[in-house]
Amino acid sequence: MTYPVSAAAPADISYSKNTPLVGLSKPPCLYQHASSSVDSFSSTFSDDDRSDLVAVPNESPHAFSYNPISPNSLGVRLTILRRSLEIMVNSPDILHELKKKAPVIAYPPSLRHTRNLTETATLSASRDPLNGSLISPLVSNMPSPASRPVIQRATSLMVLPDNDTASKLNPAKSELENLLFLLNLALENNSFERASDLHMLSLLNIKKINFDSDIQKSETLKKVLLDSLAEPFFENYKKFPHKDLGSKSQYNEYEEKHDDIVSLADIKPQQDYSRILHPFTSAKNSGPEAIFTCSQQYPWNFKAANDLACLTFGISKNVIKALTLLDLIHTDSRNFVLEKIMNAEDDNQEIVFTGETIPIVQPNSTSNNNVPNLIWASLWAKRKNGLLVCVFEKTPCDYIDVMLNLRDFSVDSIIDTTHFLENFDKKKQQESTSPMTEKKTVKFANEIHDIGSVSHSLSKLIDDVRFGKVFSADDDLLPLSIRVANHVNEERYFTLNCLSENIPCAVTTSVLENEIKLKIHSLPYQAGLFIVDSHTLSLLSFNKSVAKNMFGLRLHELAGSSVTKLVPSLADMISYINKTYPMLNITLPENKGLVLTEHFFRKIEAEMHHDKDSFYTSIGLDGCHKDGNLIKVDVQLRVLNTNAVLLWITHSRDVVIENYTTVPSQLPMLKENEIDVVGSRGSSSASSKKSSEKIPVNTLKAMADLSISSAETISNSDDEVDLNQVNEKLRETSCGKVRGIESNDNNNYDDDMTMVDDPELKHKIELTKMYTQDKSKFVKDDNFKVDEKFIMRIIEPINGEEIKKETNELDKRNSTLKATYLTTPEANIGSQKRIKKFSDFTILQVMGEGAYGKVNLCIHNREHYIVVIKMIFKERILVDTWVRDRKLGTIPSEIQIMATLNKNSQENILKLLDFFEDDDYYYIETPVHGETGSIDLFDVIEFKKDMVEHEAKLVFKQVVASIKHLHDQGIVHRDIKDENVIVDSHGFVKLIDFGSAAYIKSGPFDVFVGTMDYAAPEVLGGSSYKGKPQDIWALGVLLYTIIYKENPYYNIDEILEGELRFDKSEHVSEECISLIKRILTREVDKRPTIDEIYEDKWLKI
C-alpha cells in the first residue's frame, strides 16, 4: 500500500505506523553463534549482543553470495522489483497516467503519512500482512500526488477479470504483467535462462529497460518503474495488531505490553537473532549446495555427502569415502586451501572458510575449443566435533592467465579462455564507435604488452618491488622474479582498469621456468552482509571473504572502521535522509524492519547532487577499493533495531553471465568396474524381488546406448560402448538452456487454451495459472479452507475404499467432458514409453524447475486429457539410482517406486499415471491435484499467516499418514520438506518427489538429500543412516516449521547440539510441543516410530 503523497515541505512531515508493513524482499539467512572477531564496538551494545553480531556474517554460508541467481542475491532484489510491479499492475491510476503525455517530473518530492486516514475497505485490505506496504518519499511521477487515491492490491481471487475489464488493459499494463510473470517464474524456479536476464533488470537503470510501447509511454513507464523501486518499505519480523502507533511514546507503551517486539537487549540474543533474522531468507529453491562431511585431520577423507555433491562433482556414492577434500580442489588452489585449513587448526578456529572462491575439479569441463575450463565455487567450512563440514556452491568467475617476461616484466601473452577481456573490448568498441565506422578503439588481449594496461595498481606494485620501494625481510636473498611473485601473492587483491569501469579482482602468481604466470580472476557478481552501528556507522561485523574480494581489505584492516571506508558517501546520505526525511531515521525504534532499497540510495544521491535525471541512468554508488580506485556498488539497508542496521552490499558487472551451472554427466561412471550394484533392492511384499533386481555394469552400459538408440530391448552384449558421443549429446542438454525442450516449450505452449472446450474446466485452469503466478491469492479465504470432514475421510483407513469409490465416480463424470483431468493410472504403465512423445502434449502452464528437471501442466493433443508432466534430465540421474524392473525395464528408481506404490495406493501419496522417455528425458505423468490447482506447503506456511493449530494438525496428520504408508511398504522418502508436500484449496495433502526415495533394505545410506535444514544430526555427523529415523527427524522439523513459521535450527551447531526453543507468544498447546520434543531427539534409538507419531494424542482428531 502507498499512502497519498503530499507536496508539503519536509518540516510539515508527520509519520504514523498505523498498519503492519510487511515487505516481500528477503536477504540472506543468518546464523547466530559467536566467534572471535572485532573488538571495537559502540557502547550501545551488550557483550552478548556484540558476540552474536560478530558471528552472524561468517557463521552462515548464506551471509554472502557470488551467485547472481541464488535466492539470497537475486531474490533480494527481484522480490522488491516484483512488489513494485504488482503495485503498478494493480493500480489504475498509474496506468491511466501512462496514457497521457509524460508529465514533468516533480523533484525533489516530499512525504507525509497521514495519521487519520479514512477507514475504508481499501485500507482494511491493505492491512493484510501479506501485502507489502510502502513508504513513498520518492514517488514523483504523478502530476497531482496530493489527490491521488491510495494504491491497493487486487483483492478479487476466485473471480477472474471479465471481458470488459480485460479489454481495458492497455499495452503498458500488458508489458508490466508479462514482466511480472517472468519475475514470478524466476523467483519460483531459480531458472537460469530467465534469472540471468532478470539479474541485470533487478539492478536496472533507464537504459536497461526495453518496452514495446511507443517512446513517450515507454519513457514514462520506465520512470514509474524506477521510482517504485526506490520506495522504502517495512518488513516486520512479527505481526503487529492493527492499531495506530503514531508516536514514540505510544510505541514504547505498546512495547512494554507486548514481549514479541521487545528490544534486543531485553532478551537472550541467541533466541532473538534466530527470530529477527528468520524473515530475511527463504530456503525454497535454494541454490545447489554441495555438502560434504570429512575428517578434521589430514588427508581429510570424506565421511558423507549430499546428493547435490555427487551431481556437482560427478561422483557416485560408492567412491565418496575413497576421496579426500583436496581431490576436489584444482591444483592451482590446493596450497591455498591447505594453508587455510592448517592455520585454522593452529589457531583453534572453528570457521575455516567464509566464502572463499576457488577453482574445483569437475569432469569434462572444457570450452568449445576443447581447452580445459576452470570451474569456480565458493567454499564455506566449519570444524565441529572432530569433523569438517564443507559447503560448495558454483559461482560464475572470469579469469585470464597473464604471462610476464622475466627480464622486463612485460606481457608476453594473455590466455583469455573465458573471453573476459575480449567481451569487454567489444562492448567498449560498440560504445565508442559510430555505426558508420569499424575503427577499433581498444586493444584486444593479444595486443597488450604492458601489465599497466590491465591493472594500474598491480603494475605499480611490480614496479615498486623492482625498484626497491617495497621491500621485505629476506628479499635480498631471493631472485627478483620470486620477490615480485611473493609480494603480489601477499597483496592478492587489485582492480582491473582496462575495462569500462574499475572492477575488483584477485591475483595468484607462480614463477615458471621462463616466465611469471599471473592468474587473474574476477567475480561478475558478489554481495555480502555488513553489520553497522546505527549511531556511529562503525562496522560491527562483516563477511571477511566479501570484504577482501570486493574491497581488497582484510579483517585487521577493516575491523572497527567506519563504513565510509567502503562507501565514502554513505554517512552524508544518512545525514541527509535524517534531515530531509526524519521519519526514515534508522535509529528510531518504530523503524525496526525498515528497508531502504538500492534504488532509494541511488535516488537520494541524485537528489543531493541536484541532478534529478542522473537517478534514471545511475549504475550505483561509489565504493572505494584498497588500491584507491573507485568501484560501483549498490547498498540495501535494513534496520535490525535501534542500534544496528544490516547492509547488503553488491558489486555487479553489466555483462551477460555465461551458464556456469553445467553439471558433469553421470553416464561416464557407468564404465566403472567397481560398481557392482546400482539402484534399489526390493524389501517388502509390495516391492518383492520379482519386481526389481541388481544391475550389472555391462547392462548399464547397454542402457546408456539404449538412451541414444531408443532400442526396444536392452542388449545383453558385454562389448564396451563408447560413451563419448553419448556424453557429448547429453552435455548439450545438461543444464540451463536445453535446446530440445526449449523448442518444445515454445512450440507447444498454449496460453489461450484453445484445446480446452469446457468453460468450467477452462475457468479452473485459469485459476490454477493465476494462483501459480501469485501464491498469496491461493490462501485467501474465498479459495482456501481446510475441510476437516473431507480430510478425515481420507486419512481414516475405514473409509479408504469409500474415497477410492468417490474418486472413480469423479473420473467417470470427468470422462464425459471434451477435456478432463486424468486421475486413473494406465493399465499397463510404461507400455508406450518409446511410442508416446512429449510433442503429443501442449503446455498449458509452466509450473516449476529444479536441479533434476522441470514440471509442466499439459494437455494431450489428441485425447484432450490434462496431466502434470515431470521431465527428468537423464544426464542428471545419479548413477546410484537406476534400477532394473522386470516389467518396466531399466528406469530411475523414482519411477519404479511410484509404480510399486500404485499397487497399494494411499490418498496422500501422488500417483503415477504413466511414463515415457526420449533421448534426453524421462517424462512422468501425474494427476493435477486440486480443482483450482495446488501450492506447496512452503507457500502455505509463507502466505497463510493466520493458520490455526487445528488446521496445522489436519495438514500434518496427512503427511504422517503418507509417511506411515511408505514405511509400511519398506520405503523411506529421504527428502521430507515443506516443498515436497502440495496442498489443494481444501487442505488435501499429497506427498510428492520420490527421486530420493529408496527401499530400506538398500541401506545403510551414506548420501543424504538436499540442504542442512532437514538433515538429522547423525547424518551431518558423518554416520551412515538407516532411513526411517531420519524421515522421523525431518517430520519433526516440518511440524515445528508449520507451527512456528520458522526452522527450529539455524546452523550446524544448533542441529548437532542446540537446544529447542519455543516462542511462548504463539500459544501452542503443550501436546503439540511435547510431540515436537519427542521427535527432535538426537538419540536415534529414542525417536518415536511413525506408528507412535500417528497415534500421538495431539494428532487425535
Swiss-Prot record:
Q: Origin, by domain of life? A: Eukaryota
Q: Which residues form the active site?
A: D975 (proton acceptor)
GO biological process terms, alphabetically, are: intracellular signal transduction; negative regulation of cytoplasmic translation; negative regulation of glycogen biosynthetic process; regulation of (1->6)-beta-D-glucan biosynthetic process
Residues the entry annotates as binding ATP: M847, G848, E849, G850, A851, Y852, G853, K854, V855, K870
KW Membrane (keyword) present = no
Location in the cell reads:
Cytoplasm
Question: What keywords sit in the KW lines?
Answer: ATP-binding, Cytoplasm, Kinase, Nucleotide-binding, Phosphoprotein, Serine/threonine-protein kinase, Transferase, Translation regulation
Pfam families noted in UniProt? Pkinase
Reactions it catalyzes: L-seryl-[protein] + ATP = O-phospho-L-seryl-[protein] + ADP + H(+); L-threonyl-[protein] + ATP = O-phospho-L-threonyl-[protein] + ADP + H(+)
Which additional comment does the entry carry? Present with 2220 molecules/cell in log phase SD medium.
| Protein name, UniProt field | Serine/threonine-protein kinase PSK2
Natural source organism: Saccharomyces cerevisiae (strain ATCC 204508 / S288c)
